[in-house]
Amino acid sequence: MCFEIEGAEVARRTLERFGMEAGAVDRSAIAIILHMQPGVTLSDGVEAVLLDRGTAIDVRGVDIELVERLRTTVTRTYPRGAFDRHFLRAIAREAAKRSDCQSHSFLHEGDLTGWMARSPWAAEATRT
């Protein structure tokens, strides 16, 4: 099972355990499943758009100017450390097992490693 599906199931169980309303649980699970798919729009739900855009900022540095004034404070409080290395290792493990997962196409057809290396966050990781 692809990690976005696994993550959605873990989130679903956790949110249900905390008593979240069923519709909100479903929207959260769908957002997690869709967050690595290209072309997420408001028709997919506000949660999906926010998670998609947040992931783009966090992993690739897309639209980093939206959080630029907070970046130093955030990385000082929550150092990224070896996040990039660990994240890429996890993606590579999944891609090696499951060529039908989105992680496989990001790693082998996209430029995930390059995106992350060029991200403004990469420079922060070297300072923490």
Predicted features by range, described:
Residues M1-F3, H35-M36:
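Histidine-centered active-site/metal-ligand motif
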Residues C2-F18:
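An active-site-proximal "capping" alpha-helix that borders the catalytic cofactor pocket
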Residues I5, E9, R27-I30, D52:
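A broad detector of short, well-ordered amphipathic alpha-helices
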Residues G19-A31:
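Acidic/histidine metal-binding catalytic segments
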Residues M20, Q37-T128:
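Divalent metal-dependent phosphate-bond-processing catalytic cores, especially two-metal-ion Mg2+/Mn2+ enzymes
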